[in-house]
Regions:
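N-terminal cap/lid segment of alpha/beta-hydrolase-fold proteins
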Residues: 36-61
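Short beta-strand element of the alpha/beta-hydrolase
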Residues: 65-73
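Short alpha-helix in the alpha/beta-hydrolase fold that links the catalytic acid
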Residues: 83, 236, 250-260
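Conserved alpha/beta-hydrolase
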Residues: 88-111
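Alpha/beta-hydrolase active-site loop
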Residues: 117-141
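Hydrolase active-site cap/lid region
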Residues: 167-211
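Catalytic active-site module of serine/aspartate enzymes centered on a nucleophile-bearing elbow/loop
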Residues: 276-306
Length: 306
């Protein structure tokens, strides 16, 4: 249904003021139109990885400045269309897909959410293969002379993304929201110690958390993965966005490990948002996502891998 705006045109000495008012409205409307997200095309796609078919959606601006594949955290996650639309609106080409065994993607989801199968090295490697295949699928749909292609992910992607970048030389950068830079075993020990207590840091110290992280018994037996050893083999730029109140990933230890890698010449950066928790990419604050976008926008158009 169309909405019609009825306007009464004044006469006499108010006519010029009315024209000025209309002119102001037109100027505001033009400004708002200019602020709309970059025109982009949306396409549902499928691609194969490790013998199964994954389903996703691409959002590709007319002139993308760079491109990213969105990589899930843990859980039965479908494609992340809200985040994809936000990034595409800033000129980034995006591919987001349903995790294997979820939504329209084939395969089997490895559960439980926190347990042996989910964090086992074999499953993380399989998820990394999916992210690598998604990178190739996105690259095949991009126009010529596009900017670099990277991986942008959340939480568990702290292990998946470095694994995928090692597999695929097309990956030119990585952005990680609350991605742990520790072993999967250390992360689980920390998460079990905090036990979901949102006020954990009001009653516990970093030293106490480190002690439990080092010595608490493991509840599960699985093949471990160390983010540090993976990152030590890469030379592509990376950005981590951490929340100071995180009770799922040991943030300060992760930052210390990144500082060590940076001292070794790795092109890694991180930002800490003291008031935020683990979900640094949520609508609770726009700052981490905006920081990530600005970092990508500032990246050289062609980034060589060493």
């Amino acid at each position: 249904m169309k909405t019609h705006l009825l306007v009464s045109i004044p006469c006499g000495r108010y006519y010029r003021r009315w024209l000025a008012f209309i002119g102001l409205l037109v100027a505001v409307a033009v400004q708002q139109v200019g602020a709309q997200p970059t025109d982009s095309r949306t396409e549902d796609v499928t691609f194969t990885s490790a013998g199964i078919t994954l389903a996703g959606t691409m959002l590709i601006p007319r002139h993308p400045v760079a491109a990213v594949v969105l990589v899930h955290g843990s859980g039965q996650e479908k494609r992340m269309l809200g985040m994809a639309a936000r990034l595409a609106g800033r000129g980034l080409a995006v591919l987001t897909y349903d995790k294997r065994g979820v939504g329209e993607s084939g395969g089997v989801y490895a559960g439980p959410e926190v347990g042996t199968n989910n964090v086992d090295a074999a499953n993380l490697d399989l998820l990394a293969a999916d992210a690598s295949a998604a990178t190739n699928a996105l690259a095949a749909h991009l126009p010529a002379r596009q900017g670099p292609i990277g991986l942008l992910g959340f939480s568990q992607a702290g292990w998946v993304i470095p694994l995928a970048a090692i597999k695929n030389p097309t990956v030119g950068f990585m952005v990680l929201f609350s991605g742990p830079v520790v072993t999967a075993r250390e992360q689980l020990r920390f998460q079990f110690f905090t036990n979901g207590n949102r006020r954990f840091w009001e009653t516990h110290t970093e030293a106490e958390a480190r002690e439990h992280l080092r010595h608490d018994p493991d509840r599960y037996q699985f093949a471990d993965t160390d983010a540090r050893s993976l990152l030590a083999t890469l030379a592509i730029p990376g950005l981590w966005l951490f929340g100071g109140q995180d009770i799922q990933a040991p943030v300060r230890l992760s930052m210390e490990h990144l500082d060590t890698l940076k001292a070794q010449g790795k092109p890694y950066q991180y930002q800490l948002f003291p008031a935020l928790g683990h979900d640094t990419a949520s609508a609770q604050s726009n700052e981490p996502v905006e920081a990530a976008i600005r970092w990508i926008e500032a990246m050289p158009r062609l980034k060589k891998r060493k």
